A protein has these predicted regions:
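Long, C-terminal-biased catalytic regions of enzyme "large/alpha" subunits
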Residues: 1-83
């Protein structure tokens, strides 16, 4: 699956990047959460070919909120705005 980066270039999707970013947000809020929970959330995300980085970030925030991790979604959103 191809992802459209901020500069418009295409890159092969790497789910590990999402896991890493979510892990950082969890560490800021809930360090007791484990990587298996995060990996399961990423597996549940509905992504599509040609998705943009911004759309992926929106899906991440929505998924975190769906799982009841509002604090983590806020931390991720803050991390996102710093990028």
């Amino acid at each position: 699956m191809q992802v459209v980066k901020r500069d418009g270039s295409l890159q092969e999707f790497d789910g590990n990047k999402i896991v890493e970013a979510i892990s950082k947000a969890f560490n800021a809020c809930c360090p007791e959460e484990n990587k298996e929970v995060i990996t399961a959330m990423v597996a549940d995300m509905h992504l599509w070919d040609g998705i943009t980085i911004e759309e992926i970030q929106d899906v991440v925030i929505e998924t975190l909120r769906d799982y009841g991790y509002d604090d983590v979604a806020s931390a991720y959103s803050q991390y996102r705005s710093e990028q």
